């Protein structure tokens, strides 16, 4: 995928891309990178190199803890699309559904009812999607 844009040809981009794929999954990352155009490519480069290649690769916090932090912060910001993405990432990083529900309940006290209701609905939708993916016909 990265051979499409020359600005994506850096070691830092590849480092970030690997972590991003491990957390968010190939399908999501492939869509994001493929959709990068002249307007959005600089943001994709920044996020992949610095968010994923620099911050997510730092020592000191394991990925599971980073996911806990992200869920809390994204919930507080009331960003449903990003919350949905990071619920999947949190599951990929080893959080259980029960832990995700507890994060939402903890956040309800500090972020308020509307935010927590939205976060819970979002988490439920992700759980249902995953359950649908694993069902056998």
Map each language-model feature to its residues.
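Acidic, glycine/proline-rich low-complexity segments that act as flexible tails and inter-domain linkers
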Residues: 1-64, 92, 118-137
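Residues at alpha-helix boundaries and the short loops/turns that link adjacent helices
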Residues: 23-26, 80, 94, 110
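Short alpha-helical scaffolding segments that buttress acidic/His motifs in well-ordered protein cores
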Residues: 47-51, 68-75, 103-108
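Mid-chain, well-packed structural core segment of small domains
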Residues: 71, 75-101
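Short basic/hydrophobic patches in alpha-helices and adjacent helix-turn junctions
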Residues: 89-93, 106-109, 125
């Amino acid at each position: 995928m990265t051979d499409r844009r020359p600005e994506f040809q850096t070691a830092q981009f590849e480092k970030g891309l690997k972590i991003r794929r491990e957390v968010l999954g190939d399908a999501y990352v492939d869509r994001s990178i493929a959709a990068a155009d002249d307007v959005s490519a600089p943001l994709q480069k920044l996020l992949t190199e610095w968010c994923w290649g620099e911050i997510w690769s730092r020592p000191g916090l394991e990925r599971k803890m980073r996911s806990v932090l992200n869920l809390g912060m994204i919930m507080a910001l009331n960003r449903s699309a990003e919350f949905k993405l990071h619920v999947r990432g949190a599951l990929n990083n080893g959080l259980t559904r029960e832990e995700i529900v507890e994060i939402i309940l903890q956040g309800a006290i500090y972020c308020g009812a509307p935010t927590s209701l939205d976060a819970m609905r979002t988490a439920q939708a992700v759980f249902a999607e995953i359950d649908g993916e694993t069902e056998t016909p």
